[in-house]
């Protein structure tokens, strides 16, 4: 049996057996909400992993409806699902539970500049690593409050003096959305950027005084995603566009103060963009880009066309050595 079909069969076998409560006792555990959300994702992507089996838009809608019938809510505050004590968010369906005592969420270390930690009241070493692609941030409507909720830009200041920190290159540490690649410095041909370039991840609250990994839990699934999955399945199946539009607007109402920013009739591209804006940094982009046919596209100034083999991952050698019956995926 195909592994993806096997997985869907396994999920269907347990979907009404696992616990259905939404409580502190079920937090971090596989529940009915989590199983049905995973099924909805599989059905939404069915034409990718099993095109011979046909589209499963109605199955996706049905699975989403089960989740929508449980006691999750769209939190009035977007940040409720990303604050340090986010275990009380009723929007999170399934999460990785982190704590400072046993290691956890290390996004602050990964994204912040070496000098940014004291500016934000943190006591950690940082890597000046992850930043957002400029065109991604610029795609947001300027009135979208999720920009400020998701990306860190602007000056990083010494809290004692109020002066802007200076980077090792002698430049003010003022984070910009733009990232300017500079070539010709290294023999390997890789480009360089200035240390302050790039909007940093600001989605998970940084805890003042933090001296290790953060304890913000990471939402694998949350209800906003389910709203958008159902909306997409409705549009793809030529279903109830009014309902799809309502679902998208529930999400947009939280992000905009201006009611004119609500949609009147959503398109697939509207939903694709809404997923990009709502779910920034949450790990959904790869699936979404593959499903919408944008994953292989060139990004001018950054990368050429991605080889089609990259639509699926290679099977690690360790797995193939352990099981000679496994055949490497095409192209690897």
Residue map of PLM features:
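Generic detector of contiguous secondary-structure segments
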Residues: 1, 24-25, 180-183
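Long, intrinsically disordered, low-complexity segments
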Residues: 6, 82-136, 210-220, 252, ...
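Helix-capping and short linker residues that terminate individual alpha-solenoid repeat units
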Residues: 12-20, 71-74, 256-257
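Extended, hydrophobic/aromatic-rich amphipathic alpha-helical segments that build helical scaffolds
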Residues: 1-18, 27-51, 55-68, 94, ...
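Acidic, serine/threonine- and proline-rich low-complexity regulatory regions
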Residues: 18-28, 76-79, 208-216
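An aromatic- and glycine-enriched ligand-binding surface/loop that stacks and positions planar moieties
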Residues: 11, 29-181, 299
